[in-house]
Amino acid sequence: MIKSMILVALILAFASAKTCKYDSSGFQSYWRFANNSIMLQFMNTDIKNNQWTGIGFGDDKNNLVGVFFMVSNNQVTVRTGSTTEHGPPNFNQNGTNMGSSVSTQSALYFPEDETMSAVVQIPVQFQGRNLQSCQKWRWIKSGKIENGQLTRNSKSPKDKKVCPMECN
């Protein structure tokens, strides 16, 4: 019930601008471009405690920058960094790089149905990339967190060529 109310509130919050959507097995994402940033609602509907997930940006699968979500002790932590298609993320010092900080609006984990949902605001100029331009976005399923260390993700990320201003 609470999860549904939060999802409806987030969708209504996105309704004031053109909202884009990605829905694929295990993921639901909504985003909109406004005020030189991208407001992203990221949901992974198949993530367990002590796992990580994320979204990477870039056409080169071996050189992605992204926002990563760690679920540990049923709490969600948000960090930024870089990764490859299967590698665990390398985090930026203090989670930011080159002044491009990500603002977390909400981050929740629902252990009873293994769903993680977060709303983040990402600056268009993000870690040396212009997210306003068309490029691949890659939804990373999950990797384990073992003794505080992130392991490789075992499945290839789902990708989509995204032009944030066009909702393609």
From Swiss-Prot:
DOMON domain mapped to chain residues: 25-143
Keyword Signal annotated: yes
Composition skew (Basic and acidic residues), residue ranges: 156-168
Domain of life of the native organism: Eukaryota
One cellular component (GO) term of this entry: extracellular region
Sugar-modified residues: 35, 94
Pfam hit, one: DOMON
Protein name stated in the entry: DOMON domain-containing protein CBG21753
